[in-house]
Amino acid sequence: MSFNTFGRVFTFTTWGESHGPALGATVDGCPPGVALDEGWIQQFLDRRRPGSSKFTTQRQEPDRVRILSGVFEGRTTGTPIQLMIENTDQRSKDYGEIAQAFRPGHADIAYHLKYGIRDYRGGGRSSARETAARVAAGGVAQAVLRDLVPGLKIAGYMVQMGDLHLDRANFDLAEIGNNPFFLPDAGAVPAWEDYLNAIRKAQDSVGAAVEVLIQGCPPGLGAPVYAKLDTDLAAAMMSINAVKGVEIGEGMAAAALTGTANADEIRMGNEGPRFLSNHAGGILGGISTGQDIVVRFAVKPTSSILTPRRTINRKGEEIELITKGRHDPCVGIRAVPIAEAMAACVVLDHLLLDRAQTGGRRGTIG
C-alpha cells in the first residue's frame, strides 16, 4: 500500500493499524529551532481522544504521544520527527464475526477487492484510529505556525448534526471547548445532547457537518493551477474517514446566487484592500486573500450500528450482520480536531512552499 504521505514541503507519513501495538507519524520538512515537546502535542490529541464523553466511542485510549526523534533539548533539529502512540484498549474479539464478512458502509469490501487481504480487526488501516497520528502531526504544524504566523488561529466546530443546525445568530467561538460537540452555541447544547441520546438509544447513528475557520492567514498562499490552496484543503478534508463532501465559502449554495450577490466587492482601507463580504471563503484563484478561510464538510453516519444489515461474505453468500464493537454514534464530533490538524498541515505546507517559490515577495497596491 502506497500513498500514506501527505504534503509537499512539510510532510507526514502515518503508519499503524487500529488493533496493532502502536501507530504514529513520521514528520519531515519541519524547520529547525522550533520549541516542541510531548505536552504541546498532547493537548491536541486529548481533544480527539476516544472515550472522552458518552457521545463518542467508549474505547479507552490514553493516546499518550512519544517523540522518538527530531527534537533535542526541547527544539526541533530539522531532521525527521518520529511520533508514536501505543494502542492499549483493543478488543479484537469483537470483530471475529466479520473476518469473513463485509460490513455494509465500511471499507472492508473495497480493501478486499483491491488487495485480496485485509486486517479486519477494527478496520485495520481504514479505521479512524489512524487519525490520531494525523492529529499528532498537526500538533507539530501548529507549533511551527505559532512561531511563523503568531496571529493565525484555526478553529473547527460542528454546524449540523442530523436535523439540527447551528443558529449563527448565537455564534460564539469561545464556547467550542466547553461542550462535547465543539458547538459554538452554549444554548443549543441541551437540545443536541437530547437528540444524540435518542439516536444512541435507537442503536443508530447520525451524520454531521463540520466547519473549519482559519483566521489570520496571510495573503498569497496557494500555487495555481494544480496546487491551489482550496484544492489541497478540500483534499485534506476528503481524506478524513466518512467525509463525503467539502465546500469552500458559500460552496454549493453559490449555485443559487447571482453574480451580483456572490462577488465580494473591494474597497481601499487604511491597511490595504478591504473586502465587503466573504462569499469566496478567503480564497480566490486558489490563493489566500487574507480574509478568513472557511471550509465546510459533510460526514456520513457511522456505518457500524446494531441494526441487522444485509451483506455478503467472502464465499459470496448472502447473510445478515450486526456490527459489534465500540463505535461513535456521530463521527462528526471527533472529526473536528482531525480537521483542525489537517488544516494546520496544509497551511504550513503552503507557507513553506510559498517562501521557496516567491521568497516572500508580494505585489503592492497604492
UniProtKB/Swiss-Prot annotation:
It comes from the Bacteria. InterPro entries: Chorismate_synth (IPR000453), Chorismate_synth_AroC_sf (IPR035904), Chorismate_synthase_CS (IPR020541). One of its GO terms (cellular component) is cytosol. The keyword ATP-binding does not apply. The keyword Plastid does not apply. GO terms for molecular function: chorismate synthase activity; FMN binding. FMN binds at residues 125-127, 241-242, 285, 300-304, 326. Reduced FMN (FMNH(2)). One of its GO terms (biological process) is chorismate biosynthetic process. Its cofactor is FMNH2. It catalyses: 5-O-(1-carboxyvinyl)-3-phosphoshikimate = chorismate + phosphate. NADP(+) binds at residue 48. Its EC number is 4.2.3.5. Keywords: Amino-acid biosynthesis, Aromatic amino acid biosynthesis, FAD, Flavoprotein, FMN, Lyase, NADP. PANTHER family: CHORISMATE SYNTHASE (PTHR21085:SF0). Belongs to the chorismate synthase family. This reaction introduces a second double bond into the aromatic ring system. This is Chorismate synthase. The gene is aroC.
